[in-house]
UniProtKB/Swiss-Prot annotation:
Family listed: Belongs to the bacterial CoaD family.
GO BP field: coenzyme A biosynthetic process
Entry keyword set: ATP-binding, Coenzyme A biosynthesis, Cytoplasm, Magnesium, Nucleotide-binding, Nucleotidyltransferase, Transferase
Record's subunit section: Homohexamer.
Organism this protein belongs to: Rhizorhabdus wittichii (strain DSM 6014 / CCUG 31198 / JCM 15750 / NBRC 105917 / EY 4224 / RW1)
Compartments reported by the entry: Cytoplasm
Protein name as annotated: Phosphopantetheine adenylyltransferase
Amino acid sequence: MRTGVYPGTFDPITLGHMDIIRRGAKLVDKLVIGVTTNASKSPMFTVEERLAMVRRETADLPGVEVVAFDSLLMDFAESMGAAIIVRGLRAVADFEYEYQMAGMNQQLNNRVETVFLMADVALQPIASRLVKEIALYGGAIDRFVPKRVVQEVVARVEKIGKKGS
């Protein structure tokens, strides 16, 4: 069985993430979505909330599993028996960062390959960071995230308070 890992913060999961998940799942028998804590980011949602969100949005996709991890990506990939890591690319800036990460990951474990998938052109501008910023200023995010996620983001923004109001 060929296993792949698609790691991310998914805070929140976007339509861009969903596109990469659907396409990445076609490349392997099992795609493990690794929801991570990222010390360099300030998440809007807890790991548990993000896990629930991603599990719900991927429930209808065969061969997709969603788990949390808090370790080096290559250690996580090895623990999942993964042969590949799936990464989405939106722009040249993504490539530069991901290329460097893939090189470091190869140094850590050369048995796992990194596979880059280009984002769908219509989804390239979408980033979780921008979705949160738009929502915090009261903008509509329904074109960027799954419908149920819109409700969760709006509810969280109402709880923490909008900016500029």
